[in-house]
Curated annotation (Swiss-Prot):
Naturally occurring in which organism (per UniProt): Micrurus nigrocinctus
Family stated for the protein in its record: Belongs to the three-finger toxin family. Short-chain subfamily.
GO cellular component terms listed in the entry, alphabetical order: extracellular region
Name of the featured protein: Nicotinic acetylcholine receptor-binding protein Mnn-4
UniProt note on tissues of expression: Expressed by the venom gland.
Role of this protein: Binds and may inhibit nicotinic acetylcholine receptors (nAChR).
Primary location recorded for the protein, binned into one broad class: secreted
InterPro entries: Snake_toxin-like_sf (IPR045860)
GO MF entries: acetylcholine receptor inhibitor activity; ion channel regulator activity; toxin activity
Amino acid sequence: LKCYSSRTETMTCPEGKDKCEKYAV
């Protein structure tokens, strides 16, 4: 899953987590 941080940077959502962590793609 991919999400966007406040800076619109693509971030990865680890499996089992609904919220985006600070994992840069």
